[in-house]
């Protein structure tokens, strides 16, 4: 006869089965490091320079955050590290106290702290979403995502080309799309007005925004002629009609324009500066060399007709030229070159931004301080400062960067397991900005003979064929090579943090593979 077990005897078993459900659901990615020992955290912060730590009141309190951070960890692998400390655990309480984590308030279950370069950086107080945390870890000091602004809830935020194409295909309402870059000051100025207009026009129009600064959006930028930021395009039934170019608009201006969208009015062509007359000499590719030979002291302004800073400086430059003209040739003369027309001169003197000033003394070119006003032009021309000695070329400086040429490029990289190569031009502003970061990354791995940070000056004649073979179309360009074979283009983050994180991921991958081989043996 079967024995009947009282129901109350089964209760402890039921409770035992139910209790671990939240514990089992708190499983998290192996990419998240659980830490309880202060020494382990100290070591981690010393060896990783971009760390986000989740401190929780208990394991249960961390459940939803761990689930989210597991997906984030995968997305930022090689660029950032995520850790978890359970402050409710007896072993971890000492660590939480030492790190000044206070979770005593009833409604406070977790804290997210960010550490950079071994030190506390900031408390994470942005949106707790996948996109926001990923964006933060990829650029901890960068601006928040536009969509994090509560006022931008009526703007449609597009993340990728697939979503962009889907919007154009399926949306019946007219679309005003802002292509922008997060760092762009003009974009930041117009964004509040754009989002206010989106709210006012909700249900009638779609106002959307898309960060197209990353290189993955080159096709979109080419298709819609995105030459600067912001570029605002108007669509009807998925078809691009024209651009909206009033970047100083208010929300009311945008709303009013959308009532009757019209293409930009053709601008009345400006009179070329050279045709206006005045005391500034306007030089060309043909007469430049002869002019600087005939005049012992010449200050030349390289400009572009569309350049706002040039237009602002032009009257100051012209007024100074009039004063100097009255003094005869004793104080020198001021001259100008339209770099958009006289391209040979612009290339010869590596003109990469406008306006650029060059000073010529008896035909020789010298460096010029930052002159912008009538007074500074006159004072400097009356008594030109002795030109400071030029900074040594990058390849002449003592660094850990390997400066290669077309002759030794292949042979050198064949001996390196991991090589990150920077193709650059010495005059390029973006290259100048990246060089100290790349140099610091090279120094960080100088003791590892399998790793190299190398550089190629694409301006040098004997390197031009190599740069062309490696499909270098812009400066700087970064390529990763494995024993001399091209693997991928690096275009994520041209900073010391970005470079070192990328290389460290490659090295950690080597260690993982070595560990697996040892286990197999």
From Swiss-Prot:
S-S bridge residues: 184-187, 307-310, 428-431
Motif Prevents secretion from ER boundaries: 518-521
One annotated GO biological process: protein folding
Cellular localization per UniProt: Endoplasmic reticulum lumen
GO cellular component: endoplasmic reticulum; endoplasmic reticulum lumen
Keywords: Disulfide bond, Endoplasmic reticulum, Isomerase, Redox-active center, Repeat, Signal
Domain of life from the UniProt record: Eukaryota
Protein name (record): Protein disulfide-isomerase A5
Source species: Bos taurus
Lineage summary: Eukaryota, Metazoa, Chordata, Craniata, Vertebrata
